[in-house]
Each structure stands twice: as C-alpha cells, then as structure tokens.
Amino acid sequence: MRTIKRILIGLIVIGFMMVLSGAIMKSYQKSKELEALKIEMEGISRQNQLKKEFKDSLISEVNNYINKKAPKNRISGEAIIDACIKYNIDIKFVLAQAQLESGFGTKGIAAKTNSVWNVMSYDGWSANKIIKNGRGYNHPNESIEPYMKLLKNKYLVDGKTEYDMMQKFISFTGHRYASNPKYEEQLKYIYNRIDKQTNIDELLNNYLNI
C-alpha cells in the first residue's frame, strides 16, 4: 500500500511539475511576444515621427520659398504639397506656375478672386478662366483642386509631363494655357530657379520613402 501511495504521490508531483513547466513556458512565450510587439510599436512610432519631421521640413521649405517671393500671400504650402502628392504632379512646377500667373495670388485679378493659377472653374472637361461678375474663391487654397484637375485631365495626358508643358503648354484639345508667347520660357526659368534654390525633391523623397 505504501509503495502504491508513493507511486501515486510521485505521479501527482510529476503531473504538477509538467503543468507548472507548461505554464512557465507559455508565460515566457507570451513575454517574448509582448516584447517583440513593443519593439515593433516603438519602430512604427519612430517611423511615424520621422515621417512627420520630413513632411514638416518639406512644408517649411515650400512656405519659405513662397513667402520669400510673395510675403503677402495667403496660400498654404502644405495644401499644395498634399494636392501634388494626390495628383502626382511636380511641386516645383506648380510653384513656378503660381509665381508666374499671379505671384502666388498677390498680383493682378487673382488678388481679388483668390485664383492663384487663374483657373476659375473646372468640371472635368472644361475650364473657364474668364472671371464673371468679379466672382472667385473664398480663399486661395480653394483654387488648388480645380487647377490640379485641369492639369491632370487636360494637359498631363497621353504620357505628357510637366517638362513637356514647359516646352509647349497646350492641352490635348489644342488649347494654350496662356496667350503669352514667352510663357513656357518664363515658366521654365522660374522652375529652374526653384530647383537650384530649394531642396524640395530631396525632402519629398525622404517623406515618401520613409
């Protein structure tokens, strides 16, 4: 009887130790999983922080250029950047045209209509650049989206690029963006100046590829 009792006690102890060992192992595995998750979350947090820092630097670069050329402007560099990324349009090209068209909304009729690129309306296939009854946008930022849609749907089509537009700024329907015969030459000059004076491309690449 004593032998049987000892055997039973031994089996119970062994069983308990196995259960305890399994619990310890599960706890260890859980701890390692939590540690790995923590490291992953810290990595994501750091990545997000870097992404924010890169975008802030890009915004600062764009705003600094705009403010230098047109101190009284009211347009948002961040709004321009976001729209350019959305429509995959060269930021420097957009800035160059905004500077040429209206001094970033501070010159000519654009100062009254807030139409930075002198595009008053766009419905997807037609653009009306004639301002009727003095109507315009409530804020310069509102003129960004119509301008982007106009470029993307009428000019930057059939493989045409921003570079092509600086050679001959004509839509697929044969419409010139501006009547000024030296428009492309002036646009390209400003574009090249922006390219030399800023680090927009590098900062944008850092932001998009972090």
Regions found by a protein language model. Give the residues of each.
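Catalytic cores of secreted/periplasmic lytic hydrolases that degrade extracellular macromolecules
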Residues: 2-93, 99-210
